[in-house]
Regions:
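ATP/NTP-dependent adenylation/nucleotidyl-transfer catalytic domains that generate, transfer
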Residues: 190, 216, 244-283, 287-531
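Enzyme catalytic cores with a strong preference for nitrogen-chemistry domains
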Residues: 1-280, 291-300, 332
Length: 531
């Protein structure tokens, strides 16, 4: 929090030097969003209050809007509000409180906050500001989630401008929805709108920034950078923000996912106090993608790739992995697991006497690799990156305490078909992921001649069915009606539900889709409902 406070004060001074009258920060900027159960600690709230007072001391010659939790002084209701200070001349002149508290997907605000029921505009230098917080502007569509709308109360005071501070998480295509909602608000209330969004990652939740300005007709006047901290100045004259309508700068879904994952890795390391990563590099496409993203996020000098061949590893897999290491310039070690796997086989020979080789021995190999990369993590202080993709996580195609171990799941919200798109995107300026890694059939290489297709349908089919079930919440009947074979659909959905116990034990997964595994998708392990 001290580092955040320092950064806020630095930007107050930068804005002041640029001649600004008012500087605006994002939702809960003082403590970061979401603070989760930190909010249950009295000391944490006191630290937020101390930070707010310290920030106020630097607001001379410039006013400030900054988000932070504030106490509910009433006896009834939750102890806190999600709120924002309006600070002028070192004084906290007013406090805006959030009314519409999201309680879906990754949001859990009713757990901590009381909704606001009273609203008032801010008067500043002859300008009346309608200040709202994130969700407060999202009750405008044809299917409202809430029974009230804070702007309907604020508009009665005849404001000159709307300001909305937000911590709106990234998922691909969500920026399009965001722009529509903001433009609709500007048009509905016939007011210019300044929207300020958080940028950065908080554990698995990624915030893409992309703050925007709209005129009263709903035309976008400016769009700040995505996945990047930025300070920009705008001028309000005669109830209008100066500027001409500008077009949105589109990014493909894959470009957005790439940039989000790079930032997610980087912020996880910075905020955890670590700088170096380790991962298992198999020569396959999943670990190649994670290695590439880690090198871009942390620098190749901070990435250790560990090749762990077994007697079932192909020569081309080892070559592909070494080619990738050479292309990125990261460090690597080659540590064979053959001796470890043989030792386990020998150790278990009595108990397994007369039983054939099966999934048990395959999992022993995967867990041997897990032991190796965890040992490297422990010995050298690396953070272990998990390399499981969303398709595998969905159907349980992975080994607990083996290839599913790690501190952060980098691609656990990226389907296998998207992984291939990411590979081509990373290679767009030149081949760094070897072509053979991309074109060869995917394989865990845990038995002779093994391919993913031995256990799973083709990934185009699998990912389509998974997307319909997980993201769109379609039932098996819905998906079968789309033309997919009934036995296959029911088998896949059964695999998804049967793998829930594994997902409870996976590392946090960087969220890039509208429905990621983790806090945004909460399913029972022992439930019998199979959709």
């Amino acid at each position: 929090m001290k580092a955040t406070q320092k950064k806020i004060i630095e930007h107050i001074n930068l804005a002041k030097a640029d001649g600004a009258d008012l500087v605006v920060f994002a939702e809960l900027a003082v403590c970061g969003y979401p603070p989760r159960d930190f909010l249950e600690f009295e000391e944490f709230i006191s630290l937020c209050e101390d930070a707010g007072r310290e920030i106020a001391e630097h607001c001379t010659g410039i006013a400030c809007i900054v988000g932070l939790p504030v106490r509910n002084e009433e006896l009834a209701g939750k102890d806190l509000y999600n709120a924002a200070y309006f600070i002028e001349d070192k004084q906290i002149k007013s406090i805006a409180r959030k009314a519409l508290l999201p309680n879906y997907d990754v949001f859990d605000e009713y757990r901590y906050f009381e909704p606001a029921r009273e609203f008032a505009c801010i008067d500043f230098k002859g300008v009346k500001i309608a200040l709202t917080i994130c969700e407060d502007l999202w009750n405008i569509n044809n299917n409202p989630l809430y029974v009230s709308n804070p702007m309907d109360a604020l508009i009665k005071e005849n404001p000159d401008v709307m300001i909305n501070i937000a911590a709106s998480p990234f998922s691909y295509q969500h920026d399009d929805e965001r722009r529509i909602v903001l433009a609709d608000n500007a048009k509905k209330y016939n007011l210019p709108l300044l929207y300020v969004n958080q940028v950065g990652a908080q554990t698995e939740i990624i915030f893409d920034g992309g703050s925007m300005v709209f005129d009263q007709q709903g035309n976008m006047l400016d769009e700040m950078d995505y996945f990047k901290e930025q300070l920009k100045t705008y001028t309000l004259v005669g109830g209008a923000i100066e500027g001409k309508p500008t077009a949105h700068k589109p990014m493909s879904d894959i470009a957005q996912i790439h940039d989000a994952l790079v930032m997610g890795i980087k912020d996880y390391f910075v905020k955890s106090g670590f700088s170096k990563a380790v991962l298992g590099l198999s020569g396959g496409i999943d670990s190649a993608i994670v290695c590439a993203l880690a090198c871009r996020a942390l620098g190749p000098e901070n990435v250790m790739a560990v090749l762990m061949p077994s007697k079932y590893s192909s020569d081309h897999s080892i070559k592909d992995a070494l080619d990738l290491v050479a292309n990125f310039g990261c460090k690597h070690e080659i540590i064979s697991i053959a001796a470890a796997a043989d030792a386990f086989d020998s150790m278990m020979a009595g108990a397994f006497k007369g039983l054939p080789f099966n999934l048990t021995e395959e999992n022993i190999q995967a867990r041997s690799r897990g032991i190796v990369v965890m040992a490297m993590s422990n010995k050298f202080g690396y953070i272990l990156l998990n390399t499981s993709n969303k398709s595998e996580c969905a159907v349980g195609y992975g080994t607990l305490y083996g290839d599913m171990c790690g501190a952060i799941g980098v691609i656990g919200d990226v389907y296998k078909t998207q992984i291939y798109e990411l590979a081509h995107y990373i290679n767009k300026d030149g081949e760094v992921i070897p072509e053979n890694t991309i074109v060869k059939p995917p394989s865990a290489e845990l038995r002779p001649g093994q391919k993913d297709s031995d256990s799973l349908p083709d990934y185009d089919t699998l990912d389509t069915i998974l997307f319909q079930f997980i993201e769109l919440k379609k039932t098996s009947k819905d998906i079968i009606a789309m033309g997919y074979e009934e036995t296959l659909v029911r088998r896949i959905i059964k695999m998804v539900n049967g793998a829930e116990f594994k997902r409870y034990q996976t590392p946090p997964i960087l969220r890039v889709s509208p429905k990621a595994f983790g806090s945004g998708r909460r399913m029972p392990i022992v439930g019998k409902y199979l959709a």
